[in-house]
Every structure is written in C-alpha cells, then in structure tokens.
C-alpha cells in the first residue's frame, strides 16, 4: 500500500441518539468528539440519528398503514 493516501482505520464509538445506544466498532470516520468506553479507554465518538438499535426494520416495530380503506375505495371505484 502507498503511504499517506489511506484514511486511518481505528476503533470508534457510535452513539445512536434516538435510542441512546452506543456500540464500539472500527471505522475511518473522523470526529473531534471523544467518549470514555466501558473498558476505561477513550475513543472517538460519532453521533448518528438512526442505527440498527432504533430502525423499525431491525426493531420489529413497523408502523402499519391502514390499507383496508384504500382497497375498499379501489373496489368501489372500479366495481363492475
């Protein structure tokens, strides 16, 4: 690999501000904020609005849309 052209790949704490969930992973994302992790070490902190901890697809809390009204309206409009 060529020196000085690749971003720094390091451990970073991601904080989902919606669910107040934090997880430690590796990333090239840069930030000026830091936080103290459970192991007592300080890591860069990246705040995110949504992650797998708060996204409806992963949490199973899907918002159900009332489609029965739409179906009835369609049948009523195109009934023969």
Curated annotation (Swiss-Prot):
<comment type="similarity">
    <text>Belongs to the bacterial ribosomal protein bL31 family. Type B subfamily.</text>
</comment>
<dbReference type="InterPro" id="IPR027493">
    <property type="entry name" value="Ribosomal_bL31_B"/>
</dbReference>
<dbReference type="GO" id="GO:0005840">
    <property type="term" value="C:ribosome"/>
</dbReference>
<dbReference type="GO" id="GO:1990904">
    <property type="term" value="C:ribonucleoprotein complex"/>
</dbReference>
<dbReference type="InterPro" id="IPR042105">
    <property type="entry name" value="Ribosomal_bL31_sf"/>
</dbReference>
<dbReference type="InterPro" id="IPR034704">
    <property type="entry name" value="Ribosomal_bL28/bL31-like_sf"/>
</dbReference>
<keyword id="KW-0689">Ribosomal protein</keyword>
<comment type="subunit">
    <text>Part of the 50S ribosomal subunit.</text>
</comment>
<dbReference type="GO" id="GO:0003735">
    <property type="term" value="F:structural constituent of ribosome"/>
</dbReference>
<protein>
    <recommendedName>
        <fullName>Large ribosomal subunit protein bL31B</fullName>
    </recommendedName>
</protein>
<dbReference type="GO" id="GO:0006412">
    <property type="term" value="P:translation"/>
</dbReference>
<dbReference type="InterPro" id="IPR002150">
    <property type="entry name" value="Ribosomal_bL31"/>
</dbReference>
<keyword id="KW-0687">Ribonucleoprotein</keyword>
<dbReference type="Pfam" id="PF01197">
    <property type="entry name" value="Ribosomal_L31"/>
</dbReference>
């Amino acid at each position: 690999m060529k020196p000085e052209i690749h971003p720094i790949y390091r451990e970073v704490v991601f904080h989902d501000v919606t669910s107040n969930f934090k997880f430690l992973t590796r990333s090239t994302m840069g930030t000026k904020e830091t936080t103290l992790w459970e192991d007592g070490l300080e890591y860069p902190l990246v705040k995110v609005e949504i992650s797998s901890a708060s996204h409806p697809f992963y949490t199973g809390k899907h918002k159900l849309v009332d489609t029965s009204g739409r179906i009835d309206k369609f049948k009523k409009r195109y009934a023969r």
